[in-house]
Amino acid sequence: MIKTLAISLAMLCLLPIAGRAQNNAQRAQGTGQPAQAFELRQESDSLYRVVATGGDNNDAKGGDKANGWRLPYPVYQFQTGDVDGDGSEDAMVGVVKGTRFYPQKARRLFIFKQIDGHSSNGETCKKVRPMWMGSKLGGILEDFRFIAPADTADTTNTALPSDSATGDRRGRIRALESTTDSLYVVSDYVWSGFGMKFDRFIIKGVDKLTAIKTFSQ
């Protein structure tokens, strides 16, 4: 059973995760990109699975367990959109876990893509595979959301050219991050070919409420 998830940041009111992914898919359809191709399914309190929903995938062709990606961690966010600008939809999942280089449990960002494969029955199907399972971004990650290319020429920095003008088809991942001195920043990250890299600050060195307001715009 798919459960709708919601962000639990204090004093932050955002759309449920499933709804936000659906909104991303609707925006993608308006730009000629394919409809939503992923679902996040909850199997227990701390076990989730990212599954491919595009094409001819169904349980008879090997099932979600064979074609999806298992996430045995708490999940705080789920978004979909074209991260690397290749014209196909990717999945962004926020999980709470430690990593090899940062063993303390914290909010992380995983990015997944679909690839062509074969089910256990030998039939063609879509499989979910990781693009990036990064240890961390720049600061202490609190939340993130996907910004489609058409949305990135925002009014927070009018000096930047629009993505339509530059021809950049990559979406941005907008991150709400805290710092070691208890301040907050909102930053944009873009795909660099082998992971996410810092692109620009939207706002920095501010209190939590100001950062949340900017992040939510």
Where do the language-model regions lie?
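Beta-propeller-forming repeat regions
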Residues: 19-217
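Bacterial N-terminal signal peptides that target proteins for export
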Residues: 1-6
